[in-house]
């Protein structure tokens, strides 16, 4: 982890990148660099996805038919692949979101002090 503005960057838990990419595409189609930038911006620079992780994740999601990709021309006139969430991807996002909420509650429970004997 590296330091940035006094906060340490958060390493993504294994398996969360797909969820984060699906969530990002929920807000609209984006090319790979745009996905990485949105993740970084929406996490206040805490999450930074490198291309060595992002593009394999995008290809994996495309193989699962959770996203589609089409060629387009970017604002600076370069050819880019634009990724979009599919209906199957929206369903999977709901599943992933539910899992994340369960995990968050479980971790929050572990963080609380244990109940004293006789307390409920």
Please annotate each region the language model reported.
Residues 1-15, 96:
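Intrinsically disordered, low-complexity serine/threonine- and proline-rich regulatory segments
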Residues 2-3, 88-120:
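Amphipathic alpha-helical dimerization/coiled-coil segments
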Residues 9-53:
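N-terminal helix-turn-helix DNA-binding core of bacterial DNA-binding proteins
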Residues 10, 51, 79-82, 97, ...:
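Short, structured helix-loop boundary elements
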Residues 23, 37, 59, 94, ...:
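A cross-family signal for key residues in well-ordered alpha-helices
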Residues 48, 70, 118-119:
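Short, hydrophobic secondary-structure boundary micro-motifs
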Residues 54-61:
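Basic amphipathic alpha-helical segments that dock to polyanions
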Residues 62-78, 84:
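Beta-hairpin "wing" of winged helix-turn-helix
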